[in-house]
Amino acid sequence: MQPAASPDAATSGAARRLRVLVIAEAANPEWVSVPLVGWSIATALRAHHDVHVVTQIRNRDAFLRAGLVEGRDFTAIDSEAVARPIWRLAEILRMGKGKGWTMVTALSSKLAYPYFERKLWQEFGPRIAAGEFDIVHRVTPLTPTANSLIAPRCRKAGVPFVMGPLNGGVPWPKGFDAERRREREWLSYVRGLYRLSLSRRRMIRAASAIIAGSRHTASEFATASDRLTLIPENGIDPARFSLRAEQPGTLPLRCAFVGRLVPYKGPDMLIEAAEPFLRDGSMVLDILGDGPLMPVLQEMIAGRGLTQAVTLHGWIDHREVQGLLSQSQLLTFPSVREFGGGVVLEAMALGVVPVIADYAGPGELVTPDTGVTVPMGTRAEVVAGFRAALARLVAAPDTIPTLAATALARVEAHFTWDRKARQIGAIYDWVLDPKGPIPQPVPLAGE
């Protein structure tokens, strides 16, 4: 990437309202993960630009319930003829609910999404060519493995094509191959082959700007460094995360884990690391989430005599997360393969201090003055690192309130959805008048 432009210039947003066609195949205000990201970015952009969203038919009813008008605000593309059988096939091949996400992503991005784009171009191609839109922006799919066949067509029509934030496919860290196999991530061993695709090369050449959600994803687009910028895909809705955690700076410390109970997120590693503090009463732990590791954790907690210190809450509706998470002082989150880290930003927005494994997404969000990072290593090294980090916090709980305040300030400065819309607006300005280096609006940890 080129040197960063002025921070003020990079975050001020577009200079004028633009006519933007936002492609958000996955976008839904009633879901979480990628669909919520797609919805949130598209909605934030609507406050600054004249946006028309193109989404998949499965999201239509949620858009209508949210008050959007079909035809004026959005168009729902019916690609179910391909999407439905592909989803059924993926469910078979993933070999277990909640597993094999690389397989699911590959089938969707290589088979279902191209059909969606073909139908999109049939409807919007003439309008794009006629100059009805200033910019075409693909927000989702989030995965960098999904090629956009319409990118060269937009370029031929003279309309800038922007992609991103793109993220995903973070390599499994060394020492976690057993967890990789337990997650049925067989396809991850050959994921890198997608970079050989000719259609991918054509897409990259045609894109006016590529927004990467992480340094890893940015490294996969090195040939487009002059058009590459970094903006993490996750953000915060201040209305949804409006509570503030009490930070008395005293013991016991209330810690929380939020996420699916699967091997790579490491809830079992967390219990092992925190056991001495859970046992002596200096710490209590709330685990919010469900998944295949639930019976393992139940047995682990009972077998170690920690039932008074650890509460397994099970699945929690996303709208209710802030009520429970804001009762904690720490988010203890040893996930070893988190490409985004939305829950880390949610904790910071509540004034809850993150303690995370320093790898991929979370490691780029948490700075030394906003949380605690544990070096990545083998499973045993991560457990030992978390235990040492927790021991330091137990010994000095009065340091936590300052970290919490700085974490909240960082989110408000860079990671609300409105801030993200302004950051993307600065990219729009640049693609329409590319003077100087492409803006780099978000300071990541380590910079």
Model-derived features: positions:
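N-terminal subdomain of nucleotide-sugar transferases
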Residues: 1-77, 156-159, 436, 442-447
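Acceptor-binding helix/loop patch of EC 2.4 sugar-transfer enzymes
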Residues: 14, 25, 84-108, 155-198
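Donor nucleotide-sugar binding/catalytic pocket of nucleotide-sugar-dependent glycosyltransferases
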Residues: 160-161, 189-244, 250
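Nucleotide-activated donor-binding/catalytic signature segment of Leloir-type glycosyltransferases, i.e.
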Residues: 296-316
